[in-house]
Structure formats: structure tokens, C-alpha cells
Amino acid sequence: MKGQVMIEFIKTPIRKLLNLHLRWVCKREFRKQSFSRFNERPVELAFVFKHIARIYPRKVLDVGTGATALPHLMRNCGCLVTSIDNIEDYWPSEMVNRHYHVINDDITNSKLQDKFDLITCVSVLEHIEDSESAIRNMFTLLNTGGYLILTFPYTENKYCKNVYKLPGSSYGQNNPYITQSYSRNELSQWLEENNGIIIKQTYWQFWDGDFWTVGNQIIPPFEVGVEDKHQISCLLIQKK
């Protein structure tokens, strides 16, 4: 009993000190806010939570979390959430996520042994050069009948290896990673090889050019049809 009291006596000031640092970090981020540009997250996260509300998955895996709060928000929904990212190889300064615990795991060669009802991969796949291995591993980690939510740059009829290198690209030229824009060919191949079916696919126009980042940004973006100009797609896929 005395030992437990002593442990709590030591832990309390340490906890207060850690909380003080966290408050300082949050306040600093708040004060340093500056507007640069809008991004695609409102569209993508709306798609994610719309389908979580319909599926109500028990076990969820978020792939490529980075420093985002998505796993924390899904945990707030009651889901049991696992979060992974290739921290040591992809992030130059070993990223720290203060919202949720992120496991260091490369989805192209995942060491996870668990199975999941839903896997989310939001604006991540396009930065992975070996996309096929990433998709294959995500399907492997899904339960039969489970769901995969993918969002990425997409142009129905033409693939692009790196949109940042296209004439007229508005940003990204100095980024150390690529951003691919997928097409129906890549998507169909993934589904055929991994026994998946599309449950829902939406298309969005964010730019007046043909590919993501090309031309003038359109804010707010438009949800359009597959035959219309679009640069982003959100997909709900089921493993058969």
C-alpha cells in the first residue's frame, strides 16, 4: 500500500509537467496559425465518416497516419483502432503523433498479424511507389467482407507518375516524395488481383487543369461524374 502511494506521489508531478508541456505546444500551434491554402481533407474525411456511420466497424486500421488525428477521431466513435506509418524510412526526423500511438510499419511489407473490419488509407497511397504491394497487404489484413477506404489523386483515363512534374503544377516541386494520379486501369488491376469490388466511388474537381495541382484551384470543389473533369476520387471497396 505504501509502495502504491509512493508511486502516485512520484507520478503526479511528472504528469503535471508533461501536461504543462502539451498545453504549451497546443498554445504555440494556435498562435502560429497562418493560412496557406485549402486542401482535400474536408471531402476525404466526410467520405470516411459517412461510411463508418453505415458500416460501424469494430476493428479499424489507419495506414499512413503521419501526424494526423484521424485514428483518435475514429477511436472516439468506439472503434478499436490501430495506426501505422513508415516512420523511420519515410519521415526524415522520425515523426511523432501527439494524438495517437502510431506503430512503425511499412504497408508494402507489413509485419502486422491482426485482421480488420475496415482499413482507411487517406491521401497516402499516391506517395508509395510500390502501390501494388501496399494494396495487396491491405487486402491481406482485411477480414473477408471487410472494407477498404481509399482516397487519392485520380484521373479516369490516364495515369501520371508524379503530378508535381507536370507543366502548370501549382506546388510540390521541392517535395522529397512523388504524388501519383491513378486511373481506371490501375484500379481495375488491384480489384482483380485482390478479389475486391467497388461499393461506392465519388469524383471531385479541385482544379481547372487535367491533373491534381495543375491550373487554378477550385474552392469549394465540385462533386462531379466520371465523365467530367476530376482530380480526386474517394472509394469504398469490399473484400469478397
Question: What are these model-predicted stretches?
Answer:
Residues Q33-S34, I55-Y56, D62, Y171-Q173:
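A short, structure-level motif marking secondary-structure boundaries and short turns
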Residues R15, F35, E94, T108, ...:
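S-adenosyl-L-methionine-dependent methyltransferase catalytic module, highlighting the catalytic core
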Residues S36, E40, L61-D62, T179:
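Residues that cap or flank secondary-structure elements
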Residues A46-C160:
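Conserved SAM-binding loop
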Residues T12-N19, R23-I52:
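Class I SAM-dependent methyltransferase Rossmann-like catalytic core
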Residues P42, T68, Q231:
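Membrane-embedded glycan transfer/ligation machinery
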Residues K2-T12:
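N-terminal auxiliary segments of SAM/dcSAM-dependent transferases
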Residues E40, V63, Q113, V226-K229:
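Residue-level marker of regulatory loop/turn positions in helix-turn-helix DNA-binding domains and
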